[in-house]
Amino acid sequence: MLLWPGASGLPPPRIFPSLLVVVALVGLLPVLRSYGLQISPTASTIRGSEPPRERSIGDVTTAPPELAPESRPVNHSFAEHSPKARKAFPVLGIDYQHVRIPFEIALWILLACLMKIGFHVIPTISSIVPESCLLIVVGLLVGGLIKGVGETPPILQSEVFFLFLLPPIILDAGYFLPLRQFTENLGTILIFAVVGTLWNAFFLGGLMYAVCLVGGEQINNIGLLENLLFGSIISAVDPVAVLAVFEEIHINELLHILVFGESLLNDAVTVVLYHLFEEFANYDRVGIVDIILGFLSFFVVSLGGVFVGVVYGVIAAFTSRFTSHIRVIEPLFVFLYSYMAYLSAELFHLSGIMALIASGVVMRPYVEANISHKSHTTIKYFLKMWSSVSETLIFIFLGVSTVAGSHHWNWTFVISTLLFCLIARVLGVLGLTWFINKFRIVKLTPKDQFIIAYGGLRGAIAFSLGYLLDKKHFPMCDLFLTAIITVIFFTVFVQGMTIRPLVDLLAVKKKQETKRSINEEIHTQFLDHLLTGIEDICGHYGHHHWKDKLNRFNKKYVKKCLIAGERSKEPQLIAFYHKMEMKQAIELVESGGMGKIPSAVSTVSMQNIHPKSLPAERILPALSKDKEEEIRKILRNNLQKTRQRLRSYNRHTLVADPYEEAWNQMLLRRQKARQLEQKISNYLTVPAHKLDSPTMSRARIGSDPLAYEPKADLPVITIDPASPQSPESVDLVNEELKGKVLGLSRDPGRLAEEEEDDKDPDGGLTMRTKEPSSPGTDDVFTPAPSDSPSSQRIQRCLSDPGPHPEPGEGEPFIPKGQ
C-alpha cells in the first residue's frame, strides 16, 4: 500500500493537483474517442433486431459470421462441422456504446470529486480564490480540450439542471434551514425577495430598452417585452452561487440568512415574470386583464408551491410513524417525498424551490422524532454529499457550456447590462433597507447593507433560463446568453474573490464557530417564554405570541397524529433526567464499573478519594459528539414549552418558619460582635464626643420601625450632615467599658439600673442619653486627672489615627442579617 507523506504531517507535493487533473483528463479519453468507435463493416445486421457485437482479441478485430439469406437452403449439419464456420472464442472485447451514458456520468462525478480534493490540498489557493471560480476554470479548460480535438463539448441542458442537479442543493438548504433566524427575519427576506426582484427586473428592463433604442442597428430591433424578459432572467440572485461563496467566508447568521433567504424565495417571482413576459412576447396586444391575471399568478405559483410542499411533508412524517421495524428504508422516504414534491410543483408550473423548502421544513421535526439516530446521520451526510457533487458539476458544466455555446457579442449591450445590474442592486438594497429599518429593532448598518448588495451573485439558474429561450420567437437569444454569462463571470470571479478581504477590512461580524452550549439553549428558551408573557401583559401580539400559539396547537393535535408512541407526549425535564440516570446506572452495572465507585453516594467524597485521577481513568467516559448531539436533541424536545398557569404564591400563603427569626437574630449578634472586635483591635474609633452633647438614643437596623423615631422622654438630636463635627457613625462600644478605659467615675447602682433599662426586648443594642440626677445640674462624667498614665495613653490612642483603615471602616454599620 502506498503511503502519502502528507498523512504524517509533511506538506503534499506541488505536483499533486496537476496529477489529479491529468488522471481526470486521461479518463476522459474514451469520451473523446466515443464518436470514432464504429462497427466493423463485415458485421451484418438482422432486420428488426439488434446488430451483433464485434469482438476483438488483442489488435485483431473479428466480426460474427455472416448469416445465410433466408431464400438459400442451409445444411445445418455441414455448417456445424465445417472448419470455416468456427471462430476463436473472444477473450476480450470493447463495446463502449453499451456503457457510454453511465460511464460518462460516473467519469464527470469522479472529475468533480478529484477537483475538490486538489483545490483543498493547497490551502494558499483555496484561501484566495473561491471554489466556484476554480471549478469554472476547470470547466473552461475541459471544454477547450474537447473542442480542440474536434469534438462538440457537452452543454448544460436546462432539463438536466432543473430536474437532477438543482433539487439536491435546495433540499439540503431547506431540510437544514436555520428555522429560528429564518422566521425572525421572514419579513425582511420577503421584502428583499419580492420587492427587490421586481425592482431589479423592471429597472434593468426599462434601461436596457432605452439603450437598445439608441444603441445602433444591431440591437434597436429588441422590443420592450424582450428587454423585460431579459431583466427578469438576470435580476434573480442565485442560491447555488450564494451558498458556494458565503459558506467559505463564514459571514454572521443575520447576513447569511438574509442573502440566502432572498435567493431561495425569489424563485416564485422569477418563474412568474419569466413565463409572463414569454407569453406576452407572442401576443399582438396586451390588455389590462392579462396584467391582472399575471399578478394573480404570482400568488398561485408561490402559495401553490408551498401547499404542495406542506402536503408531501405531512405525508412523509406520517409514513415515518410505521418504520420502527424497518429502519433501513427510513432515509429513502425523506428523499423520495421531497423529490416528488418538487416534480409535482414543476408539473403544474408552480415554484419547485418553494415546494422543496416547505417539505423539508415541515417534515424534519416529526421525521427526526420517529427515525433512529443512525438514519438521521445517513440523511445528513447523504444530502451534504449529493448537494456538494451537484454544485461542483453545475460550475464545471457552466465553464464547458461557455466554450460550446453560440455567442453574439455587442459591447454596448453587454457593458450596459453589467453596469445597470450593479446600479439596480445597490439602489434596491439602499431603498429597501431605509424602509425596513423603520420597523426593525436590530437595524441593518451600512456595513450590512454593503455586504447584502455585494453578495447578490448570479449563477446557473440565469444561464439555464436564458438557454431555454426559443430562437424562433427570440432571435437575439444568443446576445442575451452572452450578456448573462458575462454577468455571471463578473459576479462569481470579481465579487466572489473580493468579498472575503472586504469582510475582513470592514470588520464585519463573522459566524461563531463554536456550538451553543446546553445552558445557552435553555436560557434562550427561557427568554422566549419571558417575552411571550411580556407580550401578553402588554397586549401586543408579536411573533413570540403566534409562535407560542403554533407550539401549543402542534403539541395538542399535530404531534399526536404524526409522531408514534410515547414520544408525542413530550415528558417533563425532571422525568427525563430520572430516565437518563437510570439508563446510566444500568450501563455501569452491565459494564462492571460499579466496583470502582465508593459506597458513599456523595460526589464530594468521590472527589476526595480520587483527587488526582486522569480524565482517561474516570469511571464515566467523555461524551462523544453523537451522544452530545443526542442529548441536545432530547433536551430541546423535552423542555417545557407551554405557558401553563402555575400556582401563585405570596407572603400570606407561605408557611412561616419558626426558626427563621431566631436564626436572623443570631446572625445579627455575630456580625455586631465581629464589628466590635475589628474596631477595638485597630484602634479605629470616632473622636470623643463633647461632654455637653448627648449621645444617640438608639442604634437599630434599618428594618426596625423605631429606628429613626426617638422616645418621648428622650431629647431629640438633630444632626447636620454638612457639619464636620457631626459623627458619621455611631460607636457601638459598651458605655461601661468606655467608662472603665477612660477612668470615669460612675455610680454602680445607677449603672446597673441603666444596663437593665438598656436591654432591648428584641435583642438589639440600645444606647441612651444620661439623664440629670437633680434639676439644674448636669450629671456628667468626672474625668480622671489628666496627668495619670492611663489618661495619657488613651489620649494618644484617640489622637493617633492608627493604621490605614480597611475598606468600609468609615461607613455606617448596617447589619446584613436580614
From Swiss-Prot:
| Positions carrying Phosphoserine | 599, 602, 605, 648, 693, 697, 703, 723, 726, 729, 788, 790, 799
Q: Where is this region: Confers pH-dependent PI(4,5)P2 binding?
A: 540-545
Q: What is catalyzed by this enzyme?
A: Na(+)(in) + H(+)(out) = Na(+)(out) + H(+)(in); Li(+)(out) + H(+)(in) = Li(+)(in) + H(+)(out); Li(+)(in) + Na(+)(out) = Li(+)(out) + Na(+)(in)
The record's Gene Ontology biological-process terms are:
cardiac muscle cell differentiation; cellular response to acidic pH; cellular response to epinephrine stimulus; intracellular sodium ion homeostasis; positive regulation of calcineurin-NFAT signaling cascade; positive regulation of cardiac muscle hypertrophy; positive regulation of the force of heart contraction; positive regulation of transcription by RNA polymerase II
Q: Where is this region: Interaction with TESC?
A: 503-545, 633-818
Bias (Polar residues) ranges: 785-794
User: Could you state a single Gene Ontology molecular function term?
Assistant: protein phosphatase 2B binding
Annotated site, Channel pore-lining, chain positions: 161
Q: Where is this region: Interaction with CHP2?
A: 515-545
Kindly provide the PTM information from the record: Ubiquitinated, leading to its degradation by the proteasome. Ubiquitination is reduced by CHP1.
Query: What family is this?
Result: Belongs to the monovalent cation:proton antiporter 1 (CPA1) transporter (TC 2.A.36) family.
Q: What is this protein called?
A: Sodium/hydrogen exchanger 1
Please tell me the species this chain comes from. Bos taurus
